[in-house]
Amino acid sequence: MKRRNFIKRASLTGLGLAVVPTIISCETEDKKDKKAIATATPVLPIVVATWRFHNATKAAWEVLEKGGESIDAIEAGCRIEEADLKNTTVGNGATPDRDGNVTLDASIMSKEGDYGAVVCMENIVHPISVARKVMEETPHVLLAGKGAEQFAVSQGFKRKNLLTKERKKAWEEWKVKSEYKPIINIENHDTIGMLAIDKNGDISGGVTTSGLAYKMAGRVGDSAIIGSGLFIDNTVGGATATGMGEEVLKTVGSFLIVELMRQGSTPQEACEEAVKRIVTSNPNYKNFQVGYVALNKQGEYGSYCIHSGFGISKYQEGKQTYVESGSYVES
């Protein structure tokens, strides 16, 4: 679609802000999903996140409804999951790597296009906050391993052993039967990726994760890599990913989605195309999961995944909802 047509459509959308939500069918080139996703009625602010992270989106919404900026909402929301011991894929109490160490990745991106990230960081509960400090307090974009941990401590963060007794026991059991192979399946992906637009219409995003369960030491997925796990362009919108990070990295998925939206695709269409890029290039796509979420400047959202079971949490107009994503492979 030509840019002038995209602008025209965006203008028409703006004229009907409070009328009806836009309905977008989940459709691929060769088949149509029976589900349909209703994009958000373009009323701001709005926050969306991967999976059923309702507590996280609620915390983010509480910032937004008070007139707070989207970047603050993102940090507040992600911190909720990082501190939750019941969430074994993020922050404190997360599943360790194959050597028994909990290593965390996180990234955050602001309306200005500034970016901060940490990878392979240990002993710090809130990597999303450290990532923001990297963005705001250093000339760098990404810090890794011990360097990231040392920087966090210099910024006032306290060290803490993140490996719980429960996760240590599970790791020890895994070692006996696994032959040191990481668990790779369509369920082993609970990264939280979050996108928010504040009342000023400015968008920010963040991602936080412990990565693939029992991964090789030093493994870095897509979550902290700009353009893969997260990308924001305040003139267009944003996108985030969850799932098999290696596949997202190879297709630079979040950047692809934002660029497709820039060219006129809806968030839903862009997410579907990003998934299609993966399944057409990897014949083993039935053995792993990838899911995308996108949000444009008009407040319209979309999501799509390879396998059913993925969805997004949305908070808007004081209401929390869960929207099941369409999928390439029908259950």
Predicted segment positions?
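N-terminal export signals
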Residues: 5-26
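Twin-arginine (Tat) signal peptide motif
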Residues: 1-7, 30-31
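A generic alpha-helix preference that emphasizes hydrophobic side chains
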Residues: 3-4, 23, 128, 254
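Alpha/propeptide regions of enzymes that mature by internal proteolysis
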Residues: 10-11, 15-16, 31-331
